[in-house]
C-alpha cells in the first residue's frame, strides 16, 4: 500500500514537471516567433519603402515628368500618383511605427519628384517596433547635379536604445556628429 502511494506521488510530480518544462519551452518559442515576425515586418517595410521611392524616381526620370508620392504614416501606406491620377497604393506592415524627418511631425507627407527623379529635400524614415524602439533607418538624398535619388539603409546596432519619444533630438544630434551616428548604425 505504501509503495502505491509513492508511485502515485511520483507520477503527479512527473506530470507537474512535464507541464512546467512544456510551458517554459512554449514561452521561449513564442518569444522567438515574435522576434522573427518583427524582423520579417521590418524587412518588408524597408523593401516596400525603398522600392516605392526607386519606382517613382525612375518613372519620373524616364518619362521626364513630375511624379508624386504620398506617405501616410498614420494609415501606414504609400500612394504613388501621376499628377492627380492614383497609380498604386502600397500597404506597410501595421505592427510597426514609422517616423519621418521631412517636416515637423506631420503624419501625411506629399513628396514631389522632379523630372530628373530627385526629391527636393533629403530626409529619413525611422522604423520602430511595437515597443517604440528604433530598429531601422532609410535615408533619402536628392542630388540635382548627378540626376538620381540615393537611398541608404541602416540597421540599428544593439548598443544603444533609441525610443520614439527622443528620436527627433537624436536625429538632430547625430546629423551633426557622424561619428556618434556610426556607433549606433550599420549601413547595409
Show the residue positions of the predicted features.
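N-terminal helix-rich module
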Residues: 28, 58, 62, 66, ...
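An N-terminal domain-start capping segment
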Residues: 24-29, 33, 37-40, 149, ...
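Membrane-proximal N-terminal amphipathic helix
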Residues: 35-66
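N-terminal single-pass transmembrane signal-anchor helix
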Residues: 1-33
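Broad hydrophobic/π-residue packing in well-ordered secondary structure
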Residues: 8-12, 33-36, 57, 76-78, ...
Amino acid at each position: 500500500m505504501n509503495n502505491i502511494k509513492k508511485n502515485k506521488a511520483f507520477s503527479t510530480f512527473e506530470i507537474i514537471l512535464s507541464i512546467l518544462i512544456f510551458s517554459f519551452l512554449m514561452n521561449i518559442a513564442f518569444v522567438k516567433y515574435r522576434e522573427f515576425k518583427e524582423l520579417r515586418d521590418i524587412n518588408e517595410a524597408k523593401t516596400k519603402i525603398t522600392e516605392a521611392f526607386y519606382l517613382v524616381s525612375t518613372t519620373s526620370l524616364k518619362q521626364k515628368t513630375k511624379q508624386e508620392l504620398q506617405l501616410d504614416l498614420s494609415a501606414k501606406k504609400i500612394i504613388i500618383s501621376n499628377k492627380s491620377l492614383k497609380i498604386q497604393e502600397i500597404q506597410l506592415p501595421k505592427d510597426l511605427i514609422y517616423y519621418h524627418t521631412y517636416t515637423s511631425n506631420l503624419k501625411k507627407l506629399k513628396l514631389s519628384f522632379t523630372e530628373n527623379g530627385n526629391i527636393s529635400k533629403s530626409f529619413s524614415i525611422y522604423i520602430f517596433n511595437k515597443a517604440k524602439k528604433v530598429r531601422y533607418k532609410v535615408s533619402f538624398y536628392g542630388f540635382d547635379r548627378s540626376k538620381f535619388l540615393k537611398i541608404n539603409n541602416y540597421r540599428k546596432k544593439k548598443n544603444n536604445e533609441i525610443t520614439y519619444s527622443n528620436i527627433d533630438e537624436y536625429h538632430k544630434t547625430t546629423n551633426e556628429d557622424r561619428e556618434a551616428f556610426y556607433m549606433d548604425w550599420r549601413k547595409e
